[in-house]
């Protein structure tokens, strides 16, 4: 009888110990590293200088099944051209593809200016003083600024989105892409044009 009781006590102890092991507290930790590509450039002499003011990072929003959009501000500096009667500033996309080495999937970055899509084929006009178009870049388009001999600056902003994706050369939805990171350059070309009668630059 004593042996039976002892066996019961031992069994109960083992069971209790098992439950105690399952209930042990634990700590789980995750870390992520963010990387910024860094380059320092100073240019205060060129006729046109455009400087992006932030980098672009798109994150997939699982609930929306799409990537978030980014507002990318940029600084524009021009060297006024004395004698100019009109000034025009236009832009178009040069490169906008993100890719990765783990597979052949690609993402296309769309660029919008005041809601209008920029393209690779046609210039999007930002400023045209002959038509009174300034697109909010009033400081550059002001009479006595673009046609002066001084430098002037203003700030604009593009909206960047992940417009579409492809895999194996065919269009695919974002949800079908495997997890990972895509990298690449988004390049927008700006062209500034002054029309007027200019004094020839002195010979060096």
PLM feature spans:
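A generic short-segment signal for beta-strand/edge and adjacent turn/coil regions
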Residues: 3-7, 38-45, 55-59, 123-129, ...
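Gram-negative bacterial Sec-dependent N-terminal signal peptides
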Residues: 1-25
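Alpha-helix boundary/interfacial micro-motifs
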Residues: 15, 21, 132-133, 197
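Extracellular/luminal beta-rich ligand-recognition
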Residues: 104, 108-137
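Compositionally biased, low-complexity repeat tracts
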Residues: 3, 68, 76-79, 128, ...
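A broadly tuned preference for mixed-charge, low-complexity surface segments
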Residues: 25-31, 90-95, 128-146
């Amino acid at each position: 009888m004593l042996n039976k009781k002892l066996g019961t006590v031992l069994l109960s102890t083992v069971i209790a110990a098992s439950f105690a092991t399952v209930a042990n507290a634990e700590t789980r930790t995750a870390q992520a590293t963010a990387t910024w590509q860094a380059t320092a450039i100073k240019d205060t002499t060129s006729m046109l200088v455009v400087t992006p003011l932030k980098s672009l990072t798109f994150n997939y929003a699982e609930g929306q099944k799409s990537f978030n959009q980014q507002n990318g501000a940029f600084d524009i500096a021009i060297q006024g051209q004395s004698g100019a009667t009109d000034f025009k500033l236009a832009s178009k996309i040069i490169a906008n593809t993100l890719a990765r080495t783990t597979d052949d999937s690609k993402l296309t970055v769309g660029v919008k200016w005041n809601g209008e899509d920029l393209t690779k084929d046609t210039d999007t006009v930002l400023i045209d003083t002959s038509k009174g178009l300034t697109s909010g870049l009033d400081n550059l388009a002001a009479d006595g600024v673009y046609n002066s001999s001084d430098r002037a600056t203003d700030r604009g902003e593009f909206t960047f989105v992940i417009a579409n994706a492809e895999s194996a050369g065919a269009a695919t939805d974002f949800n079908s892409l495997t997890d990972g990171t895509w990298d690449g350059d988004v390049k927008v070309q700006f062209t500034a044009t002054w029309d007027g009668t200019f004094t020839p630059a002195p010979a060096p």
